[in-house]
């Protein structure tokens, strides 16, 4: 499908069924941006990898791209941890952290 800005605007203005928040993104651009970002860091830090924040946006299409390139799921809650597991991330590919860490949940996730 060839979407232009005009077509997107027409669709948004003529629709009563769209809900918010609404994200308009190109999965190929997203993948290219992440891949380029990782490659730039690996020039200087060969073991670099990326962790994608589920808190920011846990849209499955974005998460699948991160998983496809070997990135990590970065989660801060039991709900996000379970989403990462549901989306196929192994525990070894999940970073569990946060501003106010809950030690009990971290221990449960580690087991």
Where are these regions (language model features)?
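A charged N-terminal "starter" segment
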Residues: 1-111
